[in-house]
């Protein structure tokens, strides 16, 4: 198995290096004058037409990397990283700088960012060199400086297209590409944002330059021209208008204040892609096709998963007015700590989906999955109101879980978890995973220090969620956990506690259409996902070959100047979408049929379960004095916790005191200021053994 893994990895590296080499060379005069004529002779066949070269050089390698990555990740389900690889990962994951607006930048991020910027600068330089010194396009008989001005606008649009070749990789939730470099879709959203800013800037400059150029030569109406055999300018204008709307509403100042406008506007991306492809044509579309193709496979599979209703078992309303929802799941569904689950409640919004942190462990809780929801914003407020009312069921759809492909919580000698407010939720799943690993006596567990900050005393109810209710003393006896809790806005413990602050649990009636959350194509079924990617892409190649050879070629004869320019791009989009729809649907339905027996067994179990009425349980030990003292989970929490009032944690002191240990893992989740403070401490010269990792809820 190790040899197979090495072989697959080598093939992926070779394909990727070749793909990058093409991107480096494609802007050069050597590629344009020497390579292109030879490549076109063999690759621009009657079956693929003018798009053949880009299809073979820039689409095929990345699609096969995606297929091979499915095989690689399937082999690596239980990873055993060599010590050399692990040391390299630590070095490349070290924080290099902490600064706004980039945030926390690691060595890996800085390296790849500099290389990507170098690629953009290299490409722009070579494109301009071609225009200014080799062949200056001047069909309008404009002045030389005007023609050069136009060339600059055209070439910077080409640079924006390079950004689009990577734009959708970070937001493909069940991506098989991101795990290869240790990333998840949630942690990669910032790269999507950076690429979006750069590409929109390039396209805006491209548009403005052409508007000025056309105004200078008295052809401003070219903005609305739609040439049937050449680039349709109107399509580009429409795409730019949509792009500006998406860009403006995605800016942090706008997005955080008016999230729903941002959310709905961002769903115009489909329309943006359509007009963009019509504008640039099929050949240029093939340059960016892999990330769009993989994104839409992921998007359609997510849609298929979301059509099922998930079985909501119970809801706990915490004294802090936050919620814990528990769903039923099949034992075969596995996920890693710090994973997230997307929720959709049709009675609140027909189209909105929101991500929430999973607090359970799939190795500890085989049949249930829990998420914690902070009451913040209109959607969560409506959900809280629904659950607080006298309902006995709630229709919920889920999507996910999504998280790291691997997460070895016991890889460090000691572990420091720093959280602020609801940032504690990812660490609940980490601690529960450690409890699961503690059942294996041969596993060495790290010492765990949880440093958590809350605004108010009642927020300590989050600590009630750390241990499952059915834990015994033997289950947690090997876990060395210490909790330092800080209450920043209160100087002492409140003398009285209102009744409404008690922890309440509500149980829901099972409904006939409810199903447990089950594995879908992706992290739990990499090979089946590989089948979808391979079959849909091969089908696309076959269909585009048939259409080109027997429908387009008899009209155009590979001249590129007779058959409608826009139709070529539309054919690519239509056939690609059809292949994704057919292949994904067939494989998904096949997998659904295989899981049908498990669903039947689940429904039989559900029908035999007696419905429990809503209860106001004794509540948190912080608030409900009626809590039974012999309750093992809460007794353990009390013994492990020290509460500090009216102060914030001295993170520098805490972290540097622990730095003397041989290997200390530091994870932080909370406000930006807290994350940046911890990152600066871990990256300072005083801390050599602190290995930093951040989790963020906002972007």
UniProtKB/Swiss-Prot annotation:
UniProt binding sites for heme: 192, 206, 266, 279
SS bond partners: none
Subcellular location: Membrane
A GO molecular function held by the record: ferric-chelate reductase (NADH) activity
SUPFAM superfamilies for this protein: Ferredoxin reductase-like, C-terminal NADP-linked domain, Riboflavin synthase domain-like
Spans within the Lumenal topological domain: 30-54, 126-190, 290-311, 549-568
Record-listed FAD binding positions: 354-357
Family matches, as InterPro entries: Cyt_b245_heavy_chain, FAD-bd_8, FAD-bd_FR_type, Fe3_Rdtase_TM_dom, Fe_red_NAD-bd_6, FNR_nucleotide-bd, RBOH/FRE, Riboflavin_synthase-like_b-brl
Side Cytoplasmic, residues: 1-9, 74-101, 215-264, 333-525, 591-699
Reactions catalysed according to its record: 2 a Fe(II)-siderophore + NAD(+) + H(+) = 2 a Fe(III)-siderophore + NADH
Family annotation (CDD domains): NOX_Duox_like_FAD_NADP
Entry EC no(s): 1.16.1.7
Residues that coordinate or bind NAD(+): 400-403
Domain Ferric oxidoreductase: 157-275
Keyword list, A-Z: Electron transport, FAD, Flavoprotein, Heme, Ion transport, Iron, Membrane, Metal-binding, NAD, Oxidoreductase, Transmembrane, Transmembrane helix, Transport
One GO cellular component, as annotated: membrane
Tissue: Expressed in siliques. Detected at low levels in roots, cotyledon veins and shoots.
One biological process term in Gene Ontology: monoatomic ion transport
Requisite cofactors: FAD
Membrane topology of this protein: Multi-pass membrane protein
Induction / repression: Induced by copper deficiency in a SPL7-dependent manner.
Transmembrane intervals: 10-29, 55-73, 102-125, 191-214, 265-289, 312-332, 526-548, 569-590
Protein task: Ferric chelate reductase. May participate in the transport of electrons to a Fe(3+) ion via FAD and heme intermediates. May function as root surface cupric chelate reductase and participate in the reduction of Cu(2+), for Cu(+) acquisition via Cu(+) transporters in response to copper deficiency.
Family the entry assigns: Belongs to the ferric reductase (FRE) family.
Name of the molecule in the record: Ferric reduction oxidase 4
Species this protein is from: Arabidopsis thaliana
Lineage of source species: Eukaryota, Viridiplantae, Streptophyta, Embryophyta, Tracheophyta
């Amino acid at each position: 198995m190790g040899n197979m893994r090495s072989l697959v990895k080598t093939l992926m590296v070779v394909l990727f290096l070749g793909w990058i080499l093409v991107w480096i060379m494609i802007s050069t005069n050597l590629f344009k004058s020497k390579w292109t004529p030879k490549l076109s002779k063999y690759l621009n066949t009657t079956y693929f037409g003018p798009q053949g070269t880009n299809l073979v050089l820039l689409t095929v390698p990345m699609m096969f990397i995606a297929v091979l990555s499915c095989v690689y990740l399937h082999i690596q389900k239980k990873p055993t990283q060599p010590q050399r690889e692990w040391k390299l990962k630590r070095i490349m994951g070290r924080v290099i700088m902490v600064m706004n607006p980039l945030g926390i930048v690691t060595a890996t991020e800085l390296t790849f960012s500099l290389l990507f910027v170098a690629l953009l600068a290299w490409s722009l330089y070579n494109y301009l060199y071609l225009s200014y010194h080799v062949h200056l396009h001047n069909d309008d008989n404009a002045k030389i400086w005007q023609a050069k001005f136009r060339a600059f606008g055209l070439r910077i649009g080409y640079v924006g297209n390079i950004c689009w070749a990577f734009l959708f990789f970070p937001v493909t939730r069940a991506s098989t590409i991101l795990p290869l470099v240790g990333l998840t879709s949630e942690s990669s959203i910032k790269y999507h944002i950076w690429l979006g800013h750069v590409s929109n800037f390039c396209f805006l400059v491209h548009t403005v330059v052409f508007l000025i150029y056309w105004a200078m030569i008295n052809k401003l109406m070219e903005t609305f021209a739609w040439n049937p055999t050449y680039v349709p300018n109107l399509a580009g204008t429409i795409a730019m208008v949509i792009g500006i709307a998406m860009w403006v509403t995605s800016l942090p100042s706008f997005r955080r204040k008016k999230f729903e406008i941002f959310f709905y506007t961002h769903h115009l991306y489909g329309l943006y892609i359509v007009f963009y492809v019509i504008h640039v044509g099929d050949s240029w579309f093939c340059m960016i096709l892999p990330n769009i193709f993989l994104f839409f496979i992921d998007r359609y599979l997510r849609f298929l998963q979301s059509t099922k209703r998930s079985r909501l078992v119970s809801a706990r309303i915490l004294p802090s007015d936050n919620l814990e929802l528990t769903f039923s799941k099949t034992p075969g569904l596995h996920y890693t700590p710090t994973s997230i689950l997307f929720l959709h409640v049709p009675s609140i919004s027909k189209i909105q989906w929101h991500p929430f942190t999973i607090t359970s462990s799939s190795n500890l809780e085989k049949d249930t999955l829990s998420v914690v929801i902070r009451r913040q914003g209109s959607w969560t407020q409506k959900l809280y109101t629904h659950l607080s009312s006298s309902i006995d069921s709630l229709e919920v759809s889920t999507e996910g879980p999504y998280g790291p492909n691997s997460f070895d919580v016991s890889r460090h000698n000691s572990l420091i978890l720093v959280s602020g407010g609801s940032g504690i939720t990812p660490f609940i799943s980490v601690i529960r995973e450690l409890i699961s690993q503690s059942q294996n006596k041969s596993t060495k567990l790290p010492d765990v220090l949880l440093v958590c900050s809350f605004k108010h005393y009642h927020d300590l109810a989050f600590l009630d969620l750390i241990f499952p209710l059915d834990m015994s003393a033997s289950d947690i006896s090997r876990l060395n956990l210490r909790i330092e809790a800080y209450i920043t806005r209160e100087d002492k413990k409140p003398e009285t506690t209102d009744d409404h602050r008690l922890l309440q649990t509500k149980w829901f009636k099972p409904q006939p259409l409810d199903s447990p959350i089950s594995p879908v194509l992706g992290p739990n079924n990499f090979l089946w996902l590989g089948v979808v990617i391979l079959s849909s892409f091969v089908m696309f190649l076959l269909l585009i070959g048939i259409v080109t050879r027997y429908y387009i070629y008899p009209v155009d004869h590979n001249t590129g100047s007779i058959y409608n320019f826009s139709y070529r791009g539309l054919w690519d989009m239509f056939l690609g979408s059809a292949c994704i729809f057919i292949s994904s649907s067939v494989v998904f339905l096949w997998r659904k049929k295989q899981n049908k027996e498990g669903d039947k067994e689940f429904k039989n179990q559900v029908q035999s379960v007696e419905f429990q009425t809503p209860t106001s349980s004794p509540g948190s030990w912080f608030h409900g004095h009626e809590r039974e003292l012999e309750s093992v989970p809460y007794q353990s929490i009390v013994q492990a916790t020290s509460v500090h009032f009216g102060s914030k944690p001295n993170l520098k002191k805490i972290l540097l005191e622990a730095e003397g240990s041989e290997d200390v893992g530091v994870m932080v989740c909370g406000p930006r200021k807290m994350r940046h403070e911890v990152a600066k401490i871990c990256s300072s010269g005083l801390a050599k053994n602190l290995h930093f990792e951040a989790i963020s809820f906002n972007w």
